[in-house]
């Protein structure tokens, strides 16, 4: 099931959950999450592909390949923290790959993602949906939709990213 221009429902849901519930798996994710992911993807595409010409395409990876719990996490999972926003269907962890002119895909460092998303105009687009971004792990960035009107996240960007080693 297509959620946005570039994301399918299966990217936000573990395969086992989708197999059981199919398109009803939308029950398990916050409606704002695909929208936030699409905003981030569009902004990264605009900043990394169009002006530079260094990349000819961009892929934002949530679930898929060896990743199955980067979106919604079932209550019984041992992945992450017990009260993680993932368990409420309000978070994704993602990596970004850029396709070079020679056809090879390469990982775009989390610090580069942090730099782009920290641009005030990008953050304004995300702020309307109460977004938190962090990257306190290696090689990926966290995006969630928790409601925090009195925190620093409601006033501007709060992004931390640590590049993969």
Enumerate the predicted regions with their spans.
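Feature targets compositionally biased, intrinsically disordered low-complexity regions
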Residues: 21, 35, 52, 63, ...
